[in-house]
Amino acid sequence: MVNLEPSESLLEGRRYLEWLASDCEIIKDYSLQGEEIWLLKIRLKNNGRKSKYIPDYSDWHVFIDSKYPNGNIQFYPSKKNGISCVFPHQSPHSEEISEEDYFRSNICLEQFSPSLEFDVEDANSKLYNYTEKALEWIKQAANGDLLADGDFFEKVAYPIKKFHKKVLFSEDEKSFVDWNKYEDERVGFLNMKAGKPGTEYQDFWYVTDYYKGVSGYMKKDATIISYSWGKYVTDEKSRGEKGIWIKLLSMPCIKPWQAPKNWPQLIKIFEENNLNFTEDVMPFLNNLRDRNSHVMMLGFPVSERIGGQISEMHWQSLELPVLSDYKTPNRFFKGFQKNIKGFEMADMRRIFFREKISLEWLSTKNWSPDNLVSRGNLSKDIKKRKFLFVGAGALGSMLAEMLVRSGVIQLDIVDYDVLEMGNLTRHSLTASDIGKYKATSMEKKLIESFIHYRGKGFNMTVEEFFKKQDFDMNEYDVIIETTGNDKVLDLIASKKLNLIVISTSLGLYAKRMYINIQHGSKVELTKFKESILEWIEKDREEFSHMEYPRDGLGCWHPLFPARIDHLSMLASSSMSIIESDILQTKESLTIIERGELGTVSILKRKEFTDGD
């Protein structure tokens, strides 16, 4: 049943606003909006400088969840006596609904003041705290201080209507250096590749190449920048798409912090960036008169932090309207023939001069490798190395997936075995891979785990792999052996490989894990086997009373016993050891042991020197 009266918590929160004295005035008490939202209209004082954008007092619609103090609190500027423009830490003006008396552009108070998200949800203080932060936001907006030097760069909030469509690019510091080589190139064509047809990803557009010149599209000698997407993108048999790129001197923005709404506003921004729309841009648009919509990408240089060094090219895309051609109605030409000049004039009349035609901004994301793994990535020195995995069993699959999901792009896998149903208890692969080779199945999984992954699976023994005619061990930096097989260890050692060789193996029931790391061409794995021999014997003694699991009826064959949670604990710990020792160029033998309640400890650690 809907409660038609505000709760005691809501009333208590409103009473606390009295402590804000003359800074906050309630102009209309609570009113119920639907079943779950209460509206409180207030007037807030500008305690900052005089501003042409912000009045001395502004009216606000405050929407509060009926479950207060739980739930959201959102501040929207009123259309009458409110703030009509957009500032940083504020959502864009979405398409206005005329009967509403407020702008749908709430202040992002949790972003402006992250501590609000962690405040204790107390009826006495929550509404007061949010209102106090709104007052501070107004003050800083008036003073021009919402973005200060040292803050992370914030892009203008471009209003998006077609959220299903995304334009994806991959820019970093290296590509920015490449862009600087073409400083005089301001406009050109680009090529994009669509996601998998017939799926929800078919409207994901991956930019692949940028070209210079009106006649440069898809010409190798006209290529400026090409992104190195992984197999997830490059192997997809999908259609390409022609678009246009324009490089600006700064982010396309209308003061104080608003995305341009229409073509006249955007064309004015082009002029401010020393670009003439009819002379510099229109010749490229004339190549897109095919009755289809196309994408326009606007690029601009940015820094990671406000006031910092410019280090990256960022892009914002929009969807172009269908341009005029011979099928366009005659009424748009008015004295002009249906030729290039006539098409241009028709477009200016029906599209580019009209303020009522809104720009169709598209969701645009930088899916560079570093950006995609920023929530949990490895060091750059690890990510840039090329790995070879020998063995794609439970341990190998876990370690390989951890490395790739953490940003490793080049990782090949060698394994001749096929996946069996019993493997699923602790393997990264799934039931759809039963009966398939582990190596190529892992390749497929890693491709879908990280879109920049470019590794390969080889369905063969390591002996066969080393004998391949096109095999070149110099292309790898690290080899990780996860088989625990003495013959494989001996073979790797005999090759005198001038790289980092890592051997990992598990004890019974994943009680212990053995990690050996050696550098250079003098890899000696005999000492490794000798060093862990006593611990292997200890495994046998400790678990002598245990009966090994079997794989169904028939001829008895013991299986390696280990639970997936125990295995993943040791694998995760070994990742940290491997990363640390590679970065510090250490050679070592480390034995880690699983303890009680999910703990892992180092049982033995020996770091080798040249004399060892």
What is each model feature region?
Residues M1-D56, W60-F63, V156, H164, ...:
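Long, charged/polar, low-complexity intrinsically disordered N-terminal extensions
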Residues N377-V418:
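Glycine-rich adenosine-cofactor-binding loop
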Residues N81-R186:
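Domain-scale recognition of soluble eukaryotic interaction modules
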Residues Y158-R349, N474-D612:
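Glycine-rich phosphate/adenylate-binding loop
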